[in-house]
């Protein structure tokens, strides 16, 4: 199993307003990261265009090269499930667990 211990985070102080359509793009983009990073060289960037004037969600996920593909996916799944709590609906975040990392923003990086 992957090591999902929390290492560090950097959270934007600006919050996504409740009910904002950006949540939808962000959710879709995080699901994309979770599903594809293990099969994309363990370092994968993607984006989801916004609907209804919502900003595009940009993201990147990285897994440690020493873990299996299934552990990479499991680590990112764990992190996606925790990122809202760690960065409480921030418009941008970087969170590192021992075996994986996710960054998301409203701008390309």
Curated annotation (Swiss-Prot):
Name of the protein in question: Antifungal protein ginkbilobin-like protein
InterPro entries: Cell2Cell_Antifungal, GNK2, GNK2_sf
A Pfam family reported for this protein in Swiss-Prot or TrEMBL: Stress-antifung
Gene3D superfamilies: Gnk2 domain, C-X8-C-X2-C motif
Species for this entry: Picea abies (Norway spruce)
Domain Gnk2-homologous: start-end pairs: 4-109
GO molecular function: D-mannose binding
Taxonomic lineage of the native organism: Eukaryota, Viridiplantae, Streptophyta, Embryophyta, Tracheophyta
Disulfides per UniProt: 11-87, 63-72, 75-100
Keywords: Antibiotic, Antimicrobial, Disulfide bond, Fungicide, Lectin, Mannose-binding, Plant defense
Main function: Exerts antifungal activity through its carbohydrate-binding specificity.
Superkingdom field: Eukaryota
Record keyword Disulfide bond present: yes
A biological process term (GO) from this entry: killing of cells of another organism
